[in-house]
């Protein structure tokens, strides 16, 4: 059933790292989970975080560390770190705890599914042909070194009366193979005809069990 499930959740702990790194007992777990959701929702609404691909939340001795993964770190940091300081203060008021904000730069945005999906969605909002946007994105992904890529758009494409889905695929995207490092993300474009959904799958290659073990140990010792 690899075709039906989320590729990220399907591979978490195998080739994908957890996006929330903390432990909570029965009394704390629900509270921590709600805090994580509020933090992510707040960051997604910030203009400085519009180009962010993801957020990792860590907790340690009453403090929260949020790592923002972005291809444009300068936009998140702001002039002389003003934006980061503002984020820290807003998150401190939101959670009532001390919050650290770290910035992780994405070196190759063409291989990040979230950034690719957001780029396609923004082009569709600017009335660029969805087929042109999809084909251009696929070309950039493959030229960046991906093994395979699949892109799907759904909705009232080009203003059609009946909603439909169209997809393009290039290379190999084995969703059933757990050792395959598949990056997956969704985005939505708000058009005058309604919402257009965008899904992107990118095959970054295969990871061996040894690589997985070292990746897991790196997470536990990082920062």
Swiss-Prot record:
CDD domains: KH-II_30S_S3. Residues 39-117 form the KH type-2 domain. PANTHER family: 30S/40S RIBOSOMAL PROTEIN S3, SMALL RIBOSOMAL SUBUNIT PROTEIN US3C. It comes from the Bacteria. Binds the lower part of the 30S subunit head. Binds mRNA in the 70S ribosome, positioning it for translation. It holds the Pfam family Ribosomal_S3_C. This is Small ribosomal subunit protein uS3. The gene is rpsC. GO terms for biological process: translation. GO terms for cellular component: cytosolic small ribosomal subunit. Belongs to the universal ribosomal protein uS3 family. The keyword Nucleotidyltransferase does not apply. GO terms for molecular function: mRNA binding; rRNA binding; structural constituent of ribosome.
């Amino acid at each position: 059933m690899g075709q039906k499930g989320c590729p990220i959740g399907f591979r978490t702990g195998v080739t994908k790292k957890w996006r929330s790194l903390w432990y909570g007992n029965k009394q704390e777990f629900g509270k921590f989970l709600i805090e994580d959701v509020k933090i992510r929702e707040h960051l997604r609404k910030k203009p400085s975080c519009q180009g962010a691909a993801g957020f990792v939340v860590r907790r340690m001795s009453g403090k929260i560390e949020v790592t923002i993964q972005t291809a444009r770190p300068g936009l998140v940091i702001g002039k002389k770190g003003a934006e980061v300081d503002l984020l820290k203060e807003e998150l401190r008021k939101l959670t009532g705890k001390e919050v650290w904000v770290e910035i992780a730069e994405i070196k190759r945005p063409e291989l990040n599914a979230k950034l690719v999906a957001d780029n396609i969605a923004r082009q569709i909002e600017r009335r660029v042909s969805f087929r042109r946007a999809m084909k251009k994105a696929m070309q950039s992904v493959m030229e960046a070194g991906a093994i395979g890529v699949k892109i799907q758009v759904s909705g009232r494409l080009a203003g059609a009366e009946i909603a439909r889905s169209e997809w393009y695929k290039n290379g190999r995207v084995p969703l059933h193979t757990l050792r395959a490092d598949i990056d997956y993300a969704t985005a939505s474009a708000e058009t005058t005809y309604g919402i257009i959904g965008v899904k992107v799958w990118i095959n970054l290659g295969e990871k061996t069990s040894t690589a997985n073990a070292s990746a897991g140990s790196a997470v536990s010792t990082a920062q």
